[in-house]
């Protein structure tokens, strides 16, 4: 591993590791290694997406979709997460509108 960084995803990775069959309390070294791999992956994808977006001048979600298009598992997961994000936005907007109407009626 390279330089020491603040752990950002340790808790989440620990739960994911357990969910995928690891022990409830995995070794700190295992979590650190996995976190380093995740961090490097995110860093690499962000750099590549920035390079793709430089051609247009603005970073967009589609740049990440473009990068994972040849990996079906990642591609369909990204598409699913984007759809869920849109559904959550719509639900939140509808909820906020309902609350505004209720406050006006009070």
UniProtKB/Swiss-Prot annotation:
Signal peptide: none annotated. Pfam families: TFIID-18kDa. Residues 8-51 form the Histone-fold domain. It is found in: Nucleus. Keywords: Coiled coil, Nucleus, Transcription, Transcription regulation. TFIID is composed of TATA binding protein (TBP) and a number of TBP-associated factors (TAFs). Belongs to the TAF13 family. This is Transcription initiation factor TFIID subunit 13. It comes from Dictyostelium discoideum. The gene is taf13.
């Amino acid at each position: 591993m390279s330089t020491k960084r603040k752990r950002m995803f340790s808790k989440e990775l620990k739960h994911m590791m357990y969910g995928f069959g690891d022990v409830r309390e995995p070794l700190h070294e295992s979590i650190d290694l996995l976190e380093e791999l995740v961090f490097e992956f995110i860093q690499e994808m962000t750099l590549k997406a920035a390079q793709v977006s430089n051609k247009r001048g603005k970073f967009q979600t589609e740049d990440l979709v473009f990068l994972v298009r040849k990996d079906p598992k990642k591609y369909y997961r990204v598409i699913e997460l984007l759809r869920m994000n849109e559904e959550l936005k719509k639900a939140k907007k509808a909820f906020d509108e309902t609350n505004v109407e209720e406050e006006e009626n009070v």
